[in-house]
């Protein structure tokens, strides 16, 4: 169910004509209205048919919760199919809407239910305060009980700020130098408020023709357009380059695993995320949420010795799956299917693991520079690990992270790790986008039977590190798009090496097109992504269109350029214009994109030939 709740001064409606699914109504319901109301526009979805009673109960609870916050005198139930592309059967939709009305009436609320299946004109006045417009997604998933509901309440974590000089402060007493670290702390403490607003990247990913949701698939499954696929592939190439330079060996493993395997089931339960599960005639299977299962199975079947250490296994999981709550799925930030770079390192022991861990934190920190994003960092450890390794933790913050971090000390181990570092960008709404991570795993080697032969030819269980140098590729793109909203004062852009079109050539008229094509070929041969705007638009409109596409360099070709065999380049980053040779332009771009991967433009180079997506 999708709802849009508007706190209004009044709502007035008038029925105009009926559809074939319209309910029968009395004359008094053809024209009506109410003052001082919470108007709940509702679309009942296909998924709601699984459990109408639960949907009714949850919808009523949500409506009453919002009504209580805004102190509305009346409630309006307004059927509004336009909120969803996956509508339920009309009979069930009516049943659910009437059920919501009945339950609200049972709560002694003043309720107006607008007729179902009629074309209507309506007039509404929104009050305009911060809570006057709220959207909600209500699902058939039952509300979860706490993992510790049958146990003693768990002791909460302790939160500190650890600075580079080793000083530790209480999070409430710390003098924050930047707001994003404070925002990370607020989120961890549950203080971040849900504004009901959509993150900017959701609009931008469609507007820039990168990606959009696939309505014919499950929620949280994305379709990628050519520009977005290019950016996604370049990021995948980047991570491959990053990890193989550090000795990782690429592998590929299945996406589906048998939960009858005790090690796989136990690890899945330890991970804690919701999973896609399916049953065949004789098996219960799970779609992987990361590459751990396949990597550990390979390592368990391999002959490892102390001379091999550290052993690195890398896989780009082009499809990882987590069955996130439907209401939590948003844009590229939280998905049910995503692309996860997964790097596992087998280390001799805990001492060796700490050394490799610090190096991998370095690698994760490097991505902050290469991607031109800003990360805040959370260093999470168990109390036992902190007591034994406090000095080492401070060294990592000083030498590898090099800025203040949120230090979370957990009373006891809940998962498979006893230490991990999480890097997170902060979105335009002040919420973290979890990106790179490094985790120290002290359980999986024994669980999966991974051993190595030490110097005395005795079998030992290693310590294993989990590392995703960037986090999911989708979240990287999410972070890049969100940065364009948070980075006030600068023109929005992607890093030059990720820009789908790096240079656009704009001929003034068709008479200049041949020269534009000559320039195009020279630039393309220099391994730079370039295209030509040969559309019938005026030059000013073409330049504005290039700006809307965030193209870093534009070259306008007119009579002067043709006569003098020259080019004049406009740089988006600083709005400068310069007459420059093609060789110097290529050198400038190659210098700015040094060591970054490159792919050619996967689109027609003539803009007039392109398809308009989404």
UniProtKB/Swiss-Prot annotation:
Note on cofactor: Binds 1 zinc ion per subunit.
Question: What Pfam families does the annotation carry?
Answer: HGTP_anticodon, tRNA-synt_2b, tRNA-Thr_ED
Entry annotated with the keyword Nucleotide-binding: yes
Q: Where is this region: Catalytic?
A: 200-495
Q: Which GO terms describe its cellular component?
A: cytoplasm
Enumerate the SUPFAM superfamilies for this protein.
Class II aaRS ABD-related, Class II aaRS and biotin synthetases
Residue ranges, compositional bias (Acidic residues): 141-154
- Gene3D superfamilies assigned to the protein according to its UniProt record, in alphabetical order: Anticodon-binding domain (3.40.50.800), Bira Bifunctional Protein, Domain 2 (3.30.930.10), D-tyrosyl-tRNA(Tyr) deacylase (3.50.80.10)
Residues reported to bind Zn(2+): 292, 344, 466
Please write the reaction equations for the catalytic activity of this protein.
Answer: tRNA(Thr) + L-threonine + ATP = L-threonyl-tRNA(Thr) + AMP + diphosphate + H(+)
Q: How does it assemble?
A: Homodimer.
Q: What does this protein do?
A: Catalyzes the attachment of threonine to tRNA(Thr) in a two-step reaction: L-threonine is first activated by ATP to form Thr-AMP and then transferred to the acceptor end of tRNA(Thr). Also edits incorrectly charged L-seryl-tRNA(Thr).
The protein in question is named: Threonine--tRNA ligase
User: What phylogenetic lineage does the species belong to?
Assistant: Archaea, Methanobacteriati, Methanobacteriota, Methanomada group, Methanobacteria
